[in-house]
Amino acid sequence: LAKKNIELNNLQKIIDIDLAGCSNKSGYLTVDNKKSGGGASLTSSIKGTEIPLFNLENILKQNNLDSAILKMDCEGCEYDSILKTDNEIMRKFSTIIIEYHYGYQNLVEKLESCGFQVEKTSPMYYSHYHIGYIYATKN
């Protein structure tokens, strides 16, 4: 669906889609195909599909980016991905939008320590967990 949307809007030269997971480290993860859908998180499984994992530094390097906008909706991986990424790498993003699931305080502190001005929404109860949004921009 995402690829079709990119084609319909003539964005092929702007947006690239990698079928992968985001993590604090690069590697591979086997995902159980039966545990998918809205709100599914990436946890390692014995059976399923092996997918590559990329960290934020790898994503910037592989796409030859010195600056980027980051939008994360990764069902819980935002904590390791953001909190364990070096501040120098985080500063390469001009804008960061994050859907959070288990609280925002640590994420906000990390982003502010990287020089971002941060706004957040109050958590909303959705299905069986709370979610909210963080909007971080450079001054």
Q: Predicted regions span which residues?
A:
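Phosphate/nucleotide-binding beta-alpha loop and adjacent structural elements of enzyme active sites
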Residues: 1-139
